[in-house]
Amino acid sequence: MADKITSREADYSQWYIDLVRSAKLADYSDVRGCMVIRPNGYAVWEKMQAALDRMFKETGHVNAYFPLFIPESFIAKEAEHIEGFAPECAVVTHGGGEELAEKLYVRPTSETIIWSSYKKWIQSYRDLPLLINQWANVVRWEMRTRLFLRTTEFLWQEGHTAHATPEESQEEVMRMIRVYKTFAEEYMAMPVIMGRKTDSEKFAGADETYCIEAMMQDGKALQAGTSHNLGQNFAKAFDCQFQTKEGVLDYVWATSWGVSTRLIGALIMAHSDDRGLVLPPKLATRQVVIIPILRGDKAAVLAKAESMAAELKENGIPAFVDDSEQNSPGWKFAEYELQGIPVRIEVGPRDIDKGVCIAARRDTLEKTELQLDATLAVQVSGMLSAMQADMFQKALRFREENTREVTDYETFKSAVEEGFVIAHWDGTAETEEKIKEETRATIRVLPEESDYREHYHMDEPGVCIFSGKPSSQKVVFAKAY
Amino acid sequence: MADKITSREADYSQWYIDLVRSAKLADYSDVRGCMVIRPNGYAVWEKMQAALDRMFKETGHVNAYFPLFIPESFIAKEAEHIEGFAPECAVVTHGGGEELAEKLYVRPTSETIIWSSYKKWIQSYRDLPLLINQWANVVRWEMRTRLFLRTTEFLWQEGHTAHATPEESQEEVMRMIRVYKTFAEEYMAMPVIMGRKTDSEKFAGADETYCIEAMMQDGKALQAGTSHNLGQNFAKAFDCQFQTKEGVLDYVWATSWGVSTRLIGALIMAHSDDRGLVLPPKLATRQVVIIPILRGDKAAVLAKAESMAAELKENGIPAFVDDSEQNSPGWKFAEYELQGIPVRIEVGPRDIDKGVCIAARRDTLEKTELQLDATLAVQVSGMLSAMQADMFQKALRFREENTREVTDYETFKSAVEEGFVIAHWDGTAETEEKIKEETRATIRVLPEESDYREHYHMDEPGVCIFSGKPSSQKVVFAKAY
């Protein structure tokens, strides 16, 4: 079973690493900075992929696959892009036993290689929009790594779209950041703030970057997804022009957007506890474990457990029985709490006599008596739905309790150690940089949602927390992963 | 629409490339030897992945993800393995702006990186079997490339399993090659011969390689999947020992097995024709296109087409309407034949008056009148099932017609230019090599299936086609992709 997991209170960072490794979600590999995503962790990624892929297709996107390698000259075509990415690339210099004439970068992101194809595919407005997504691995050389959150190689999806007008591309940017918000909140049960990044935090090569930001249990922020308005930057870099409806030539308008296996780290940090993983039911491959208490008429108990599992599965609830006799029920309880199975059901001979079983929810650890009758699947389904909804509400409450509106810099400095801080900013990169230097807090997001803006009075004018200069709006500061 | 596709008769190789590019399945990229899998091609891969992934899970496997990079010293640990793979690897020498202390190979296959993890995960027989699959990209430097069939980077799945006994690992090897055979025949409608490879054709590092071999329309063979019995080779290379039930230490027994995007090339070469792609319905994302003939009461025709599509979709048949007025019905017929939509339905005002529509099957181009009544979905479903079955039978007949049993070397030399040749072989690598040098034909497979062996009298003793020495069995020779 599990090695002991450090408590969150004792050492939050160590708790995270202990949990990831004990629950067999991921492990460091023998390759510097690269992780192995173990089957338990990969199963979560598969559930995420399935939900996201469906949402991408419902919004008109198709999947494709572009090369892993990018010629050095391609990366260099977009000035900000190469400045942002070149220093963190892995570089292939030899292939097939020979030194290459041109170095190949292992993709850190695929704008350049994709736009070199789009240039060939797009001639006229009739070829637009082009709405393509790719599921792939990418590599960014990292000095300090942390499983799922920051590794040299990670898995992600990257959408790359091409449009005839800036209005359409901006619509796409917003559509996709909203898809991410819906996914984060409805599947991951993780509330997120949707909004814009400041210029200094945006993607290298973008005109504008939108993001969703979540709060972890230590009060830090985690950027959970981004959607970029690339303007005509990459079309110009790759000379990708099209004939408009009006018959003139124009450069194509572009977006890109992505989420990665980082989301698994976010999921863990948002919900899990000192016993192990807490998984929202919608992302659990196995939602219910049934543990038979093998006393008295063992065969009858086991048969009951199996028939319960069969009934749940017939009703679309993935359930399984752990009937191993080498481990005690107590050991199993701990093991499945560690693994984050959303609902545990125990059933013994006395329960069967009474026509009941005991179900425990992983998030609250609350036990409920369920009736062993034809409504079993309905009862369990109700527990799972309630758990999904309650996890979101709990995380939302936590975020609200750990968000402070602050007006003086001294309070600001202590407040950013605890959670999100809403404060006035004078809009300059200098102030942003100085605050970062002094506190390590950054501007996470300029929220776009009116209910959030109103709740925190973000549109009331005031003075900058740092410079004292006039400020037209408040922004969200936090320390971040 | 499509550029003209060269006919198979005129130039089979050019036909293939023309088809792949005209149907927008894939394209060469600006990176040497690497392809772009375009949305139409990737959709086929997604259908293949879904079916295979389900079959892997039904046989007890789970997915995981291991690093892209393999330290040079790992590849070197298994002697045959490094000899086979090192010359065709892409090598990363720089990362994060600095030269690396140890070179990293971009994985050509993952046995070594995976066994370096398995060593940590396996201590006792209780940890076995370990049944893991990975969906990933791999890189093998290729001098002469061909879209899907041979490219520097390709996508695949690689299963890597660990077992306590050689019997169990051999069972796994056979289970998975049979899964591949089932997939090839039931989904791809492509008959395959299942059997063993000779020593010279087996995987670098395997004790034994099993394969499925298919015949393309030019009579050449294509290896469509392999399953390797790795013995204890990788366990020994990585010092991966476990405590047996009996309490002694032993090395773990291993298998690996894989199929790749090469299957898309096989699918095209097995079934397609001079008009374009012919897709078996089970691998078609869009199974039915409805083309309204927009004459007379256009709105009524369009409404009928839409209601037909809705009815088909409700019954699980993915159908869509092409109602664009800028292209003629004739243009659309050609376009969807090129794209390989299995069934095309045309419906016009006169059809509606008569209560019928005209459906055409892509494989035979045969037209059938369907009744526009409540049984429409049943009628279409019947067409799709018949098409799936007929495509398999046609390919099987083709293989049988192009397989010859040959007893003299002169006939052999001309026969291998046409198709598969069943002939006696003395069992030596020397003979195998000389035949390859003289004819470019190789021993594709030592069939394992008794019906195939009996049909071609493979177990009757005789004399080697080349050396005249005694031979205990016949084998299958062919030129191959």
Curated annotation (Swiss-Prot), chains A, B:
Keyword match Iron:
no
User: Subcellular location, in the record's words?
Assistant: Cytoplasm
**Keywords of this entry:** Aminoacyl-tRNA synthetase, ATP-binding, Cytoplasm, Ligase, Nucleotide-binding, Protein biosynthesis
**InterPro entries xrefs:** aa-tRNA-synt_IIb (IPR002314), aa-tRNA-synth_II (IPR006195), aa-tRNA-synth_II/BPL/LPL (IPR045864), Anticodon-bd (IPR004154), Anticodon-bd_dom_sf (IPR036621), Pro-tRNA-ligase_IIa (IPR002316), Pro-tRNA-ligase_IIa_arc-type (IPR004499), Pro-tRNA_ligase_II_C (IPR016061)
- Domain remarks in the Swiss-Prot or TrEMBL record: Consists of three domains: the N-terminal catalytic domain, the anticodon-binding domain and the C-terminal extension.
The family assignment reads: Belongs to the class-II aminoacyl-tRNA synthetase family. ProS type 3 subfamily.
- Describe the protein's quaternary organization and the partners it interacts with: Homodimer.
Q: What does this protein do?
A: Catalyzes the attachment of proline to tRNA(Pro) in a two-step reaction: proline is first activated by ATP to form Pro-AMP and then transferred to the acceptor end of tRNA(Pro).
Which NCBIfam families does this chain map to?
proS_fam_I
Q: What protein name does the entry list? A: Proline--tRNA ligase
Q: Which gene encodes it?
A: proS
